[in-house]
UniProtKB/Swiss-Prot annotation:
GO cellular component, one term: endoplasmic reticulum membrane
Taxonomic source organism: Mus musculus (Mouse)
Residues at the active site: S983 (nucleophile), D1103 (proton acceptor)
Residues annotated as domain PNPLA: 950-1116
Regulation: cAMP does not regulate lysophospholipase activity in vitro. Slightly inhibited by organophosphorus (OP) compounds such as mipafox, which is likely why mice are less sensitive to distal axonophathy induced by OPs compared to humans.
Name the UniProt record assigns to this protein: Patatin-like phospholipase domain-containing protein 7
Pfam families the UniProt entry points to: cNMP_binding, NTE_Ploop, Patatin
Catalytic activity: a 1-acyl-sn-glycero-3-phosphocholine + H2O = sn-glycerol 3-phosphocholine + a fatty acid + H(+); 1-(9Z-octadecenoyl)-sn-glycero-3-phosphocholine + H2O = sn-glycerol 3-phosphocholine + (9Z)-octadecenoate + H(+); 1-(9Z-octadecenoyl)-sn-glycero-3-phosphoethanolamine + H2O = sn-glycero-3-phosphoethanolamine + (9Z)-octadecenoate + H(+); 1-(9Z-octadecenoyl)-sn-glycero-3-phospho-L-serine + H2O = sn-glycero-3-phospho-L-serine + (9Z)-octadecenoate + H(+)
Gene3D superfamilies per record: Cytosolic phospholipase A2 catalytic domain, Jelly Rolls
Length: 1352
């Protein structure tokens, strides 16, 4: 049995072995056969390849051996169709321009050919290539200053004559005989190094002009050390206008602390100030103008620099009493004549109490005596609940609406006329002045009515009744006033002096008042206060005692009152109005000497010292103030005109760094840090500057250390302003503006003058100017000037070259009065058109958008001449006309234009009305307030720097909330002047910029959002994910179907889109080019859409949200005052799990799959990459949210995802409700009103201009500024602790009233009278009779003010 089993096992083993060997053998054979088969197939393929190659080579050789026959060309059918199609299009395109006649047959043929043209385009499918904006360098005149400075060698006049002419020009324009008279007194003085020109103790009676060499002006400190405050170079002078005034008035004084010496061997021209006395004797009317200019310089230059910028107040005035003894008043009051300046105060107060005039306890009025003129009146005070009555103005009258003063001697008082213009009054006859006294009754700031009002008359001698005693005191006080004013004719004050008694607490005049009076205190005191800089607190400057004047500086200069006058105790004083004083001055010009001398005596010795250091410069257009790399030795203040700052880069290219307007501080950073000039600054147009040397600034810091705080404040504003400027921030982030025409730096702002020029004869320039004036009137006082009203006001010869100075001076005065002056040029190159261009800060080239973009004659003249003012292209469109198009062609033909705007004009602008009908129509238009949403209001806000920008952020479907916010903006009356955005914000912003209405924007946005929810389109757009998941074809078509072929330049609103340039690693701001392409590029998320190739330079553009998701800083750089930023981006989770130093993916997997484990918040790789991509964006967003110009809004849309486009209506409603709530709060709290107010009119101008020294830090600046020596503590006035707080109610002016649209918006001071008068039309368009009331402060054509006539 065992053997059988073994045999079976052995047999089985043998069988297995046999089968295994068979299997191995089979596999070997199979592999061999497979190998052989492979070798065979390979051999066959090789043979086939060799055979095919041999065949083609053989055929090619045979072809080469054969003689090639002449080819027979033929047109393919599609080529024939293309040829005839192009031929048809050429014919159809030219035919409409050659058709003549208005018959129906030609019109039908035109329509047929148009249909054929469109059909041919569809069949042939031509790809239309739209023109692109050509990048051009700015014109040389824009960024380059004139190379020729004040050239003495090439002049035909001697150098001494040129230098003297340059320096006496500060006193006004002297005619040739007057200047030659002055030149007779010039003396040459040779000085050696170290030799003194003058020293303390010598009489201060001369003007010194350096012809060769250099002088040093020194001020002696209290410890005897001399400080150099000014270096005088050839062409400059050493003088004090206050000292010249002392010589003219006969009160010469010696130098006390000021000296001058020659730093090197020098030649000096010496002109004694007494030479002016001889000129004034021959030309008495010149005296008024020279004194007025000296007073204007004192107020506008000295006080502007020392008070507004350095914060000095009490240091500028002499608190000591300058009163004269009231001898006549003392004799009448029954007291002995005393030598003290403030006279018999108690006796006068008892004699002038209101009870003296009352006949009963109920306050019945005294008998009023009146003759042919109202010579005297007296009254009792009314109860306080009867309201406030302006007794000052009621007693004196303003006379602004009476007829002009007629005088027979033409041309004899031209300087007096200019003085009248600067003082902003209209001359009157004596009778008109007297009659106006009883007719004027106004609301004022005076708390109570005066106890007595008397008008002086030497012919009236009635001392009976209750008013007799006061009448005697009044006449006695008037005699003392005659003594102070140095008048010997009492009749000059006849009917021109008012005697007032005010109780304690009366506010007599307020700081900033325009219509002021000269007050002569008889009893009591008037306290003079001034508001501190950047504070509401008042400080007491000085007290006006009996025998002293106050208010005379503002009357002489015509400038606003620079302090507040208040009676803290019962006070009696004489009052002379501005109009009355100028009537006295017309008869006796030398009256200004006595009045001006009282102003000079009130100035402190410190002001006298600084007057030697301060200079008043006149700079012609194109002249460089300083150049980049020059030594910083002074600071400039712009008084009038405009300056431009240009920086030269290392590669030699120039960039516009900024512009400076009226009141701006220039070069202060380099001066304080003692660094070289960082930029070149030149004059855009003729400008006036105040020059403050660095030495004078150092001397002021030594004497008054509190100035250091003010300087640090100014520097802080400069630095913070530069950081908040969009251009600066953009350059730090790689701001790439290659797509813009050229880098403008800061857009035009702080403009004082704007000129409008027509691009063709068909432009309705008159209607355009009136519409723009109407829109500007909502911002501030505006004046429209044309050649017609200039000739009507100033005479037919006003534009002649002989009267250039007088015209320039008058135009400068209008700039002082108005917020902005609008110049309407003529249709051709006339002298007035040249004057408009010369005076303009910005030039508007007005064209018709429907016309061909041809260059007009005036534009060609602008290109040929070096006009430095920036030019803006304004294209007018009809309301029912086609949308803007072909803007690129307009801009490419005008390289001198730095920007453009499209205006949709009302029908009245294009109406074919005659001039009288046009005037009549606009008279009615000006009775209504302008529409803040109109395009003209948008232009007005952009010209004045008050534009409101709307910035829309990116966030996918959450951006649908922005449509709801647009609805809320429209309902709450918030205008939008500039719009832009990123990603979905760029899309929504483009829709609104194209439509300008919420309803159309919502319809088109919803249409696009519905297309984004299509699953089929999404699937069809999928591609192999090498660059992105989608090809972008479907997304491109969805956007291009919305915007078609629109260009960014053709949008109604200024628009910009933000993209990320991954080729240059920079941010791109797109303001021109194909609209749909740049919107698509701004919406290209990485991984989903491929980058868009920029059609201009081929750079790859991605979603702008990676670098700036809420570009409020870009909108700020485009000129917006306020930026409303709507943030709809997703918020990142910040509460993440702290997992330690290492992280295991298995641990995270366990935490995720285990339902019982605690959930952890750890970012995955995709989230980490996304956050890295948005790091720069988050940083930029925080900067924007913390800026003071940005109003940040974020609707509650966190619950919606990025691709929830199907919830469009729901998200839109969320945005609307949030926006309506926020904007309603703005309306109630006054935020919206503040947005719409002029930034220069609501608050003091802050110097947040261009940061001209970018290489310094704030710490260094503060350290350098604080480097001063100890100084004495300034004496504090004992009266400074008086109560200074007061409340005042300004008169309410009805909005529906409208006085005049040619001088719209004149500021109505708290003490001014508002009497609306309806005119028939603007002075530029009406006869002189119709236009008389539109310039109430200017004399009539027949007046003897600024009227200019030919010498013949």
């Amino acid at each position: 049995m065992q053997n059988e089993e073994d045999a079976c096992l052995e047999a089985g083993y043998c069988l297995g072995t046999t089968l295994s060997s068979w299997r191995l053998h089979f596999m070997e054979e199979q592999s061999q056969s497979t190998m052989l088969m492979g070798i065979g197939i390979g051999a066959l393929l090789t043979l086939a390849f060799v055979g095919i190659t041999f065949f083609f080579v053989y055929r090619r050789v045979r072809r080469l051996r054969r003689a090639e026959p002449t080819p027979q060309y033929r047109f393919r059918k599609r080529d024939k169709v293309m040829f005839y199609g192009r031929k048809i299009m050429r014919k159809v395109t030219t035919l409409p321009h050659t058709l003549v006649g208005n018959t129906s047959a030609p019109r039908q043929r035109v329509r047929k050919r148009t249909k054929v043209l469109s059909l041919a385009k569809r069949i042939l499918r031509f790809k239309k290539e739209y023109p692109t904006l050509q990048p051009k360098e700015p014109p040389p005149s824009l960024l380059e200053a004139d190379l020729t400075e004040f050239d003495v060698k090439n002049s035909h006049l001697p150098s001494e004559v040129l230098y003297m002419l340059k320096n006496v020009r500060v006193l006004g324009h002297f005619e040739k005989p007057l200047f030659l008279e002055l030149c007779k007194h010039m003396v040459f003085v040779q000085l050696q190094e170290g030799e003194h020109v003058f020293q303390p103790g010598e009489p201060d009676i001369s003007i010194y002009v350096v012809q060769d060499g250099r002088l040093e002006v020194c001020i002696q400190d209290a410890d005897g050390t001399e400080v150099v405050v000014k270096e005088v170079l050839p062409g400059d002078s050493v003088h004090s206008l206050l000292s010249i005034l002392d010589v003219i008035t006969g009160h010469t004084a010696p130098y006390k602390t000021v000296s001058a010496r020659a730093a090197v061997s020098s030649t000096v021209l010496w002109l004694p100030a007494a030479a002016f006395q001889g000129v004034f004797e021959k030309y008495p009317e010149t005296l008024v103008r020279v004194v007025q200019i000296i007073m204007v310089r004192l107020q506008r230059v000295t006080f502007l620099a020392l008070h507004n910028y350095l914060g000095l107040t009490t240091e500028l005035f002499n608190p000591e009493s300058q009163a004269i003894p009231l001898l006549s008043v003392a004799s009448v009051a029954g007291r002995a004549k005393r030598q003290m300046s403030y006279g018999p105060e108690e006796q006068l107060e008892r004699s002038l109490r209101p009870s003296e005039f009352s006949s009963s306890d109920h306050g019945s009025s005294c008998v009023t005596v009146s003759g042919p003129l109202l010579k005297r009146s007296c009254s009792v005070p009314l109860p306080s609940n009867h309201g406030e009555v302006d007794e000052l103005r009621q007693s004196q009258g303003s006379g602004s609406n009476t007829s002009a003063f007629q005088e027979s001697h033409e041309g004899a008082t031209s300087d007096l006329g200019m003085a009248y213009n600067r003082a902003r009054i209209l001359p009157h006859s004596d009778e008109q002045l007297g009659n106006s006294l009883a007719s004027k009754s106004k609301k004022s700031v005076v708390a109570e009515t005066p106890s007595a009002i008397f008008h002086y008359s030497e012919n009236f001698r009635d001392e009976t009744g209750a008013c007799g005693k006061t009448d005697a005191i009044f006449r006695a006080a008037t005699k003392d006033l005659l003594t102070l004013m140095k008048l010997d004719d009492p009749s000059l004050l006849d009917g021109r002096v008012a005697f007032l008694h005010v109780p304690a607490g009366t506010l007599v005049s307020k700081q900033g008042d325009q219509d002021v009076n000269i007050l002569f205190v008889v009893s009591g005191m008037l306290h003079v206060y001034q508001q501190k800089i950047d504070s509401l607190e008042d400080t007491c400057l000085f007290l006006t005692h009996p025998g002293e004047m106050v208010g005379q500086l503002a009357v002489l200069t015509g400038e606003p009152l620079m302090f507040t006058i208040r009676a803290n105790r019962d006070c009696s004083f004489l009052s002379i109005s501005k109009a009355h004083f100028y009537e006295i001055m017309r008869k006796r010009p030398d009256v200004v000497l006595g009045v001006a001398h009282t102003v000079v005596k009130r100035m402190s010795s410190f002001v006298r010292q600084i007057d030697f250091a301060l200079d008043w410069m006149e700079v012609e257009a194109g002249r460089a103030i300083y150049r980049q790399g020059d030594k910083s030795d002074c600071t400039y203040i712009v008084l009038s005109g405009r300056l431009r700052s240009v920086i030269r880069k290392d590669d030699g290219k120039k960039r516009l760094a900024g512009e400076y307007g009226r009141g701006d501080l220039v070069g202060v950073v380099e001066t304080l840090t003692h660094q070289a000039r960082a930029t070149t600054v030149h004059a855009v147009r003729d400008s006036e500057l105040a020059k403050l040397p660095a030495g004078a600034l150092t001397s002021i810091k030594r004497r008054y250390p509190q100035v250091v705080t003010r300087l640090i404040h100014l520097l802080g504003e400069k630095i913070l302003g530069s950081l908040q400027q969009g251009s600066a921030t953009g350059h730090q982030l790689g701001f790439n503006t290659a797509s813009s025409k050229w880098d403008l730096g800061n857009p035009p702002g702080n403009l004082s003058t704007v000129a409008a020029l027509p691009a063709s004869e068909d432009v309705p320039l008159t209607a355009f100017a009136l519409e723009l004036q109407h829109a500007l009137s909502a911002i501030g006082p505006v004046l429209l000037l044309t050649s017609d009203n200039i000739k009507q006001r100033l005479g037919s010869a006003a534009l002649d070259s002989i009267h250039e100075y007088r015209l320039s001076s008058w135009l400068g005065q209008q700039e002082d009065i108005h917020r902005i002056v609008l110049y309407q040029a003529d249709g051709t190159l006339t002298p007035w058109t040249q004057r408009c261009i010369r005076q303009a800060d910005c030039i508007l080239i007005v064209g018709l958008g429907e016309q061909e973009p041809a260059v007009g004659e005036l534009e060609q003249m602008l290109e040929s001449t070096a006009v430095r003012a920036q030019k803006q292209l304004i294209l007018l469109h009809k309301e029912d006309g086609p949308v803007p198009s072909r803007t690129v062609e307009w801009l490419n033909m005008r390289s001198w234009c730095s920007g453009h705007l499209h205006l949709c004009c009302p029908r009245r602008v294009f109406s074919k009305r005659s001039l009288p009908k046009l005037v009549e129509m606009y008279t009615r238009v000006f009775q209504r307030p302008p529409d803040r949403h109109s395009d003209f209001s948008r232009l007005a806000r952009m010209l004045t720097g008050n534009a409101i920008a709307l910035v829309l952020g990116g966030g996918g479907a959450r951006g649908c909330a922005q449509v709801g916010i647009l609805r809320a903006l429209a309902e709450c009356g918030v205008p939008v002047d500039i719009i832009g955005g990123t990603s979905i914000g760029a899309f929504m912003g483009a829709l609104f910029a194209e439509e300008r209405s919420y309803s159309q924007t919502r319809i088109r946005a919803k249409q696009w959002a519905e297309g984004m929810t299509s699953m089929m389109k999404t699937i069809l757009d999928l591609t192999y994910p090498i660059t992105s998941m989608f090809s972008g074809t479907g997304f491109n078509s969805s956007i291009s179907n919305i915007f078609k072929d629109r260009q960014i330049e053709d949008l109604w609103l200024p628009y910009f889109a933000i993209t990320t340039d991954i080729t240059a690693s920079a941010m791109r701001v797109h303001t021109d080019g194909s609209l749909w392409r740049y919107v698509r590029a701004s919406m290209s998320l990485s991984g989903y859409m491929p980058p868009l190739c920029d059609p201009k330079d081929g750079h790859l553009l991605m979603d702008g949200g990676y670098i700036n998701n809420l570009p409020a800083d870009v909108a700020r750089s485009m000129g917006a005052k306020v930026v409303i930023a709507i943030d709809v981006g997703s918020r990142d989770e910040t509460d993440l799990t702290n997992y330690g130093d290492a992280l295991s993916g298995w641990w995270l997997l366990w935490k995720r799959w285990n339902p019982l484990a605690t959930k952890v918040k750890v970012l995955n790789m995709a989230e980490i990459q996304t956050r890295l991509a948005y790091v720069c964006c988050v940083r930029q967003l925080e900067m924007v949210k913390n800026s003071d110009y940005c109003e940040y809004l974020r609707p509650p849309i966190d619950s919606y995802r990025t691709l929830d486009f199907g919830k469009f209506d729901e998200i839109c409603e969320v945005g609307y409700q949030h926006g309506r709530t926020v904007f309603d709060i703005w309306v109630r709290s006054g935020v919206l009103e503040k947005m719409l107010q002029d930034q220069q009119g609501t608050s003091k101008r802050k110097d947040c201009g261009v940061f001209t020294c970018p290489n310094s830090s704030f710490t260094d600046l503060a350290e350098i500024v604080s480097r001063i020596e100890p100084a004495k503590v300034a004496a504090v006035d004992d009266e400074s602790d008086y109560q200074t707080e007061y409340e005042e109610e300004l008169p309410a002016i009805p909005k529906e009233t409208y006085a005049d649209f040619q001088s719209t918006g004149i500021e109505l001071d708290s003490d001014s009278e508002y009497e609306p008068s309806m005119l028939q039309g603007p002075p530029s368009l009406t006869s002189p009779e119709q236009s008389q009331d539109s310039f109430p402060w200017l004399p009539n054509q027949d007046d003897q003010g600024p009227r200019l006539e030919h010498p013949s």
